[in-house]
Amino acid sequence: THPSYTLYTSGTTGKPKGVQRDTGGYTVALAASMKHIFDAQAGQTYFATSDIGWVVGHSYIIYGPLIAGMTTIMYEGLPTRPDAGVWWSIVEKYKVTHMFSAPTAVRVLKKQDPSWLKKYDVSSLKALWLAGEPLDEPTAQWISDALAVPIIDNYWQTETGWPILTLANGVEQQTTRFGSPGKAMYGYAVKIVDESTGEELTGPNQKGVVGIEGPLPPGCMQTVWRDDARFVNTYWKSIPGRLLYSTFDWGIRDA
C-alpha cells in the first residue's frame, strides 16, 4: 500500500487532483493486464506513443512492459515529424509487436499521404490499442484497413491506472464493433446510471454516467494526495442515492 507516485489529472476545472497510486496493487494490476489484455510475452517489443507525464506513459511505457519482460520504446516527438512515416519506421526497425496510441494521432495520420504506411514493413505488429478519447468508426476502419491487424479500443482513466473496458484477448479471443471499447475487465463492476437519480440503466442505448461499484480493483487510486475527504466526496458521493465511484464520463450500453 506504500504510494508509488502521484499523478495529477488532466481536468481543467477546480483545484488539481493528485491521484495517489499504491505500489503492490499497481504492480499486480499491470502484470495481469499485460498478460490478459495484451497477451504479452517476454522478449516482445511494446511501443506506446504517449508521454510519461500521462498515465499511459507510467503504466505502458515504463512499468507494464518491463514487468512483462518486454522491450519498451520511449519516443518523444510528433507522428508527422520528420515525416508521417516516423512511427512505422520505428515499428520496422525494432520489430514492434504491441502498439498503443490515441485516436487523435490516428486522425492526424489519416490526413497524410497514405503511401507512408506502405514504405515500411509492419508485419511484426500483432495489434494496435487506442485510448484517451472516443474512437470513431471511420478512423478505426481506416487504420484497420491500413495495418491489417486488430484495432482494440479501451477505456480508462488516470484514476484507474489500467483499462476499465477493453478486450481480454490474452484470456480468449474476443471481438467488438468499432465504436465500442468492449467489456468490463475483471474487478470492475461497471454500471450505467441516471445522473439525477442514481438509478441503474440496464436497457440498450440509454445514456448515463459510467459508475463502478466498490471496492475498486488493484491498481486504482488510493486517494487524492493529502485530501482524503475530497477523494470520498468527489468520486464516491456525486451519484445520488448510492455509494458508487463516478467516472464523470457518459456511457451507453449497446447490448
Q: What are the functions of these language-model segments?
A:
Residues 42-43, 68, 77-206, 213-219, ...:
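Conserved adenylate-forming
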